[in-house]
């Protein structure tokens, strides 16, 4: 475990409050909550982590209570990762953020709320669990979708969120780009044409991954959902006879990022509990909670326990293949970038 694991003398009850609630950060004077009987914590997260943190908040509350004697109430806020980052940067109060990718945390850093070096605060570049991108198709796979070529062919209805607001959508896009890059040996004109054809098949761009799942699962739209692996497995768990997962030949290692919001925790006096909240995500107990919720545990030994669930031999590129998030964002998703160039609104 990393050296920031602080066993503190204060604490928490297993009450987790969910929804998109949070209070605007007002910057009142610094205080210390370590001697309070109860402390509150707000975790601003991305769209499909509701179930994960519903489970995690319960075990963390128990852990904190045992370690410190203090009760903790954790409030959750969920939405598209990019949108959530913007909300925090603009004043939505968060003690911690657990977002879909490093770039979104950097946006909060750039607003002056998170200190430089946050990515090194916890193990694995502050990514306690990972995921990847898969296809969710209807039972029997009626459109015979096996790889990215099939997603881009005529007559296929695709559901994916908007990469302008959703972290998962950016992972989706980059996974498709990686496939096309391999297929066309780096010929960017052909790669862009492939991505354009794929997005011409998109029926609706929801703002976040959970909204896209709702469009596909509950509203019956589309033939294939480009999805976080965990979101696809949850859909099958809830509807076991209606959907199948297809693993593409090339996908991407999706690394959600976690960080303490320094400006907020120092004002609220919650740094100790906030730091432990994120640090405990690396505990064996929490790593199994991640696996049970279909995220790939960072701990390789615990990941092996889920070898019957996850394809551990999947061909994955990483964000480093795109020059890191700053470069990927600038080239593909910033205003005037490639996505704006190729996507035509219906």
Identify the residue ranges that each predicted region occupies.
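Ligand-binding pocket segment of bilobal, Venus flytrap-like solute-binding proteins
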Residues: 184-249
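Short, low-complexity disordered leader/linker segments with a strong preference
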Residues: 1-40
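Residues embedded in well-ordered beta-strands
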Residues: 134-136, 244, 257-259
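Early extracytoplasmic/lumenal segment of secretory-pathway proteins
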Residues: 28-111, 121-122, 228
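Extracellular/periplasmic juxtamembrane helices and adjacent flexible linkers that interface
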Residues: 265-346
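Alpha-to-beta junction loops
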Residues: 91-97, 155-156, 218-227
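Solvent-exposed loop/turn segments at secondary-structure junctions
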Residues: 48-51, 81-84, 102-106, 140-143, ...
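A conserved helix-loop-strand patch within extracytoplasmic ligand-binding domains
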Residues: 109-182
């Amino acid at each position: 475990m990393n050296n920031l694991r602080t066993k503190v003398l204060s604490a928490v009850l297993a009450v987790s409050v969910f929804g998109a609630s949070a209070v605007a950060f007002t910057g009142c004077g610094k205080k210390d909550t370590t001697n309070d009987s109860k402390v509150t914590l707000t975790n601003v997260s991305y769209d499909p982590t509701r179930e994960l943190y519903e489970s995690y908040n319960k075990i963390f509350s128990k852990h904190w209570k045992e370690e410190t004697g203090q009760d903790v109430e954790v409030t959750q806020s969920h939405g598209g990762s990019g949108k959530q980052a913007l909300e925090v940067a603009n004043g939505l109060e968060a003690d911690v953020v657990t977002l879909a990718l490093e770039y979104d945390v950097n946006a909060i850093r750039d607003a002056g709320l998170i200190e430089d070096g946050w990515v090194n605060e916890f193990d694995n570049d502050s990514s306690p669990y990972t995921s990847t991108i898969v296809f969710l198709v209807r039972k029997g796979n009626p459109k015979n979708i096996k790889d990215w070529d099939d997603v881009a062919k005529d007559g296929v209805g695709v559901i994916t969120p908007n990469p302008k607001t959703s972290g998962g959508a950016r992972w989706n896009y980059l996974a498709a780009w990686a496939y096309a890059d391999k297929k066309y040996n780096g010929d960017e004109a052909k790669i862009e044409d492939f991505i354009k054809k794929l997005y011409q098949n998109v029926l609706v761009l929801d703002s976040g991954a959970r909204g896209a799942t709702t469009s596909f699962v509950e509203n019956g739209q589309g033939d294939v959902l480009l999805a976080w692996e965990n979101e696809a497995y949850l859909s099958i768990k809830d509807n076991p006879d209606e959907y199948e997962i297809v693993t593409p030949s090339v996908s991407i290692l999706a690394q959600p990022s976690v960080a303490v919001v320094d400006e907020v925790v120092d004002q609220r006096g919650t740094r100790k509990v906030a730091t432990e909240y994120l640090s405990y995500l690396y505990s064996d107990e929490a790593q199994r909670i991640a696996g049970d919720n279909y995220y790939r545990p960072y701990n390789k030994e615990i990941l092996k326990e889920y070898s019957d669930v996850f394809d551990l031999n999947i061909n994955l590129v990483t964000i480093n293949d795109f020059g890191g998030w700053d470069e990927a964002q600038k080239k593909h998703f910033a205003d005037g970038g490639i996505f704006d160039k190729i996507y035509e609104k219906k």
